[in-house]
Amino acid sequence: DSTSVKGREKSCRKNTPKKKVKKKRGRPKKGEERKKEPRRLELQGTRTLEKNLNDLAKGCDWGCKKDSKGKKMSWRGYKLHIDCVDGDIPVSAIVTSASVHDSQVAIPLAQMGESRITNLYDLMDAAYDAPEIHNYSKGKEHIPIIDDNPRRGEKKEMDPAKK
């Protein structure tokens, strides 16, 4: 899971992206398919730990998250992501920019933990409910126990017999 770390410095400027090739406007014609750029989670499963860590933003930035009561909380600073075992013993930790979503750090944390411990289960909350994380966990022969994220108002209750 992650926690906020407030920073005193100003939030850093985003790297201005290089000029992108202009895309064709409008809807694609029949039979035409446009390439989608792969998301960060799609790339992380095949890359090394070093490349995954270098891809994550590490500068001071604004972050926002909802607490358990639904109240939004925002801060300027960083986010500390920690991978723990039973008894809240930390195995690996990564400090990222506050704007990085928790799910984007799940695979690098798992890669760091692989070299340190052997585990059979991956227990995560609803923020990590992504097919890429499920597939990565199953590929390592772990059993993913990830709470379902209620998308569009429908929450699936976890049934232990089916998971």
Report each predicted region and the residues it spans:
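Short, charged, surface-exposed secondary-structure boundary motifs
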Residues: 153-161
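Generic hydrophobic, helix-prone segments enriched in Leu/Val/Ile
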Residues: 120-121, 161-163
